[in-house]
Amino acid sequence: NLNKNGLTVTRDEFIVREEVYIYPDTLVWISDFTYSQNDPMTKGYFSHPSFSNYPVVGVSWKQAKAFTVWRSRLNEAYKLSKNLPLRLDYDLPTEAQFEYAARGGRVGTSYPWGGPYIRNAKGCLLANFKPGRGNYVDDGGAFTVYVKSYFPNDYGLYNMAGNVSEWTSSIYNETATAYVNSLNPSFDKAVKEGDPDYNKRRVVKGGSWKDIGYFLQNSARAYEYPDSEENI
């Protein structure tokens, strides 16, 4: 192939291989979660069977993306071995796809459960998050909780708000609303190794156990850097 200057471009110049350390950061409870019983959590969260159905934490965007590639290849190999038709690859959702899934088919709702409030009619909190300043336990959990602790949304999806935040594939930009629409719902661009860090930010959605209720809203958006391994 020739580039715009008429020079030959080799395959190695536009296909980049990167090895990604796949295991989550098991020390994340000490390094990032300063008020979460971090010593016993560090020792048991990733190994004790009591946490088997708790969400994984300490996963960077690169690790999450690498997992989708591995899972797609595993699925492809299985389908080929059984002579079954292939299907679409696994991937991280775009910001728009995540919000669509979080709404569960509802229109104009603030939260995945469909209502505008974070409590039900009996005063019970509807997700695992931080209800107030320094208050992590009012919802019954001082940190992450069992993934089915709260009801799923109308699509049957759990934890679309609270517990842990979720990575998306979308680049974060404060002015993204000026560029996205129904025909182009995701703001994205090619990120190069030498780009400044603010160009590499990725949208995270859903809010986590250590976020206030605002970030649990379907429309709320935040960002993390690709190498971040915090409450995600």
Identify the meaning behind each predicted range:
Residues 3-5:
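Non-catalytic, alpha-helical, charged scaffold/linker segments
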Residues 10-230:
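Functional-site microenvironments in short loops/helix caps that host divalent-cation chemistry
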